[in-house]
Every structure is written in structure tokens, then in C-alpha cells.
Design a protein with these regions (language model features):
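Solvent-exposed adhesion/ligand-recognition segments of exported proteins
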Residues: 1-90, 114-117
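GD-rich hexapeptide-repeat beta-solenoids
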Residues: 6-10, 35-40, 182-183, 206, ...
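Feature marks extracellular polysaccharide-active and adherence modules
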Residues: 29, 39, 52, 58-60, ...
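Small-residue (G/S/T/A) turn/hinge positions that recur once per unit in extracellular repeat modules
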Residues: 42, 55, 62-63, 81, ...
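Right-handed parallel beta-helix
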Residues: 63-134, 143
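Short, solvent-exposed linear patches
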Residues: 118-121, 144-148, 168-172, 194-198, ...
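Low-complexity/repetitive intrinsically disordered segments
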Residues: 333-344
Length: 344
């Protein structure tokens, strides 16, 4: 991108080769006076779409995407990138990011925000009413000294494969105040994985995950999930806070968490350290709850207070198979339904 003629993505004179990228990588690695802007359906489909080198791409309307199976990078080659999708006025005042409105983006491969290489920084902000679809994996902060930030204020985000927030020595933060985030494929969601540090902060909107959800997974990992206000999480299969030598924390002051499927809600599993502090909101589990599970290295602590409500449809086990478990009840309510028993 040169921006020689105007801000219009579809104008050939704005590109260094004199053509709108088609079947080639589209690279925005500068932020000149004429900021690269997509304001209508793109006239040609690039291969990878890359925003790096301090570059900025504003997407105010229309549909854009990558070529079949190709990737989108926000931050690459030891540099930062900014992607604003939709009304860029919503990110005025020096706030940069990935703002989603009437436009639509389809990443046919992976979406990488400050990810897939060292020393990368990516910032994404999603708002208003359009759609973002990721056919591959979604990374926010991956690899050493790489930082990714993703904010969802409204709109619709759909991911078909794994989600990583803070992975492989990277730092990732996902903040959600509205909208919907849905994972459709049969793979896991990680917040803090394999020496990565991940945070998920949700005060509104709805997250729907159809597979395992791990907060703090693997050696050296630190994961934190904070839910408040009107936030809603629907998750199937295992929901584990602190797993396989990872450290995880769940703090809940409001909102609703519903765990469906046949698997379990586990706090501290297989050498993992998990801590849950619930002072409000409702957690419903349709199977077992284990606090400190599987071996002597597992440690789980669950503190229930205030107006917090916990409902478990099967057993509640505090300290299982040599694990160390602590259940503190200083208010709130615990209900077991069905054939549920409590073991301490």
C-alpha cells in the first residue's frame, strides 16, 4: 500500500505494483495521510492479508476476505498492525483497533493478532453490527514477546477451529462487553496455554463454545477469566480452571455460566492450580464438579459468597484421587440435583 492516489482500497494507483492485489499477499505496512480504507466490496481477493510495520487498515463497509485457506495477520515481522473494521469514528481519540460495523470479513484460514512469530503486536476491536468469520484457528498473542489484544463490543464473531488467547510464551487479552462469540468446530478454547498468559474479561455479550474450555493449560501457563454484569457463557464438554501444570483463575461477580455436555467442571486438574471466586451470578453444571482432581499435584479452591448461585446436576467432589481441594462457603447457594452427592 502506498496511498498515492486516495484512501480507496479498490484504486490500483494506491498499490506499489499498480494493481489491486489478487492472488497475491496484500500488505499494509505504512500509515500515510491516505489510510488504506475498504468502503465497498473488494474488487479482487488477495492471498494473505497482512497489516504490519505500523500499518493501519480501516474497513468501513463492504465485504472482504482472504483467498481460499489463506491467513490474516495483524502484526508481523517484529512490528505492530492495526485493523479497524467499520465505523472508524468509533475508535477516535487515539484508540486503535478492529472495529466491526456494516462490513464483513471472512478469514478463510487462520486469524492471527500479535501471533505466529516473536515480537509481534496486534490490536483488534470489534463493534456495531457486522460479521467476522474465521474458518481456521484464532490466535490472540502467540510466541515470545508477542502481544495481542482483541475487544468485542458488539457484532458477531464465529470461529470454526481452536481459539488461543495467550499461547506459547505470548500475551493475549480478549475483552467482551457485548455481541456474540461462537466457536463451531470440534476443538478447544484456551485462555493461557503453554507458558502463555491469557486474560478473558467479559461484562456483556454471549460466548458459546461447543468443546473443551481450558483456563490455564500446560506448564508455565497463566489464564484468567473474569465475568460480570450481563455476560453469558455457554460451554460444552470439559470446563477446566488450571490444568496439566497450568494456573487458572475464574472470578465471577455477575452473569451466567452454563456447562452442558457429558463432561465435567474441574478446578485444579492433573498438577494444575485452579481458583474460583464466585460472589455473584449463576453457574449451572449438568455433570460433576471436581475441586482438586487426579493427582497430588492438583490443587483447587472454590470460594462462594455474596449472591453467587451454584447448581450441580451430579457429584461435587472436593479433593479427588489425591488432589487437594478447598470449598469455602461464605454466602450464596449450592444446589445438587438428580443423583448428585457431595464428597469432601
Amino acid at each position: 500500500w502506498t496511498g498515492t492516489a486516495s484512501t480507496d482500497w479498490n484504486t490500483a494507483g494506491n498499490w506499489s505494483l499498480g494493481i489491486v492485489p489478487t492472488g497475491q499477499n496484500a500488505i499494509v505496512d505504512t500509515a500515510p495521510a491516505n489510510i488504506a480504507t475498504i468502503s465497498a466490496d473488494i474488487s479482487a481477493t488477495p492471498n494473505d492479508l497482512v497489516v504490519r510495520g505500523g500499518g493501519r487498515l480501516d474497513h468501513t463497509a463492504g465485504t472482504a476476505g482472504t483467498g481460499g485457506g489463506s491467513w490474516m495477520f495483524v502484526g508481523q515481522n517484529d512490528t505492530a498492525g492495526t485493523y479497524n473494521l467499520a465505523n472508524t469514528g468509533s475508535v477516535a481519540g487515539g484508540i486503535t483497533g478492529f472495529a466491526q460495523g456494516t462490513g464483513s470479513l471472512n478469514a478463510t484460514g487462520n486469524l492471527l493478532v500479535g501471533a505466529f512469530g516473536d515480537n509481534r503486536t496486534g490490536t483488534v476491536r470489534v463493534n456495531t453490527s457486522a460479521t467476522l468469520a474465521v474458518s481456521g484457528e484464532f490466535f490472540v498473542g502467540d510466541s515470545s514477546n508477542s502481544v495481542g489484544t482483541f475487544s468485542l463490543e458488539s457484532g458477531t464473531v464465529t470461529v470454526n477451529n481452536k481459539i488461543f488467547v495467550g499461547n506459547n510464551n505470548g500475551v493475549g487479552a480478549l475483552t467482551m462487553t457485548g455481541g456474540t462469540l461462537t466457536k463451531t468446530g470440534g476443538d478447544q478454547t484456551f485462555v493461557g496455554r503453554d507458558n502463555g498468559t491469557g486474560t478473558l474479561t467479559q461484562s456483556g455479550g454471549t460466548i458459546t463454545l461447543n468443546h473443551d474450555f481450558y483456563v490455564g493449560q500446560g506448564s508455565g501457563a497463566n489464564g484468567t477469566y473474569t465475568i460480570s454484569g450481563g455476560g453469558v457463557l455457554n460451554t460444552g464438554r470439559d470446563f477446566v480452571v488450571g490444568r496439566e501444570s497450568g494456573t487458572g483463575a475464574l472470578t465471577m461477580t455477575g452473569g451466567t455460566i452454563t456447562k452442558t455436555g457429558d463432561e465435567k467442571f474441574i478446578v485444579g486438574h492433573n498438577n494444575g492450580v485452579g481458583v474460583v471466586a464466585q460472589s455473584g451470578g449463576t453457574i449451572s453444571v449438568n455433570n460433576e464438579l471436581y475441586i482438586g482432581n487426579e493427582n497430588a499435584g492438583a490443587s483447587g479452591t472454590y470460594t462462594l459468597s455474596g449472591t453467587g448461585a451454584l447448581s450441580v446436576a451430579n457429584e461435587v467432589v472436593v479433593g479427588r484421587e489425591s488432589g487437594t481441594g478447598i470449598l469455602n462457603v461464605d454466602g450464596g447457594t449450592i444446589t445438587t440435583t438428580g443423583n448428585g452427592n457431595m464428597y469432601i
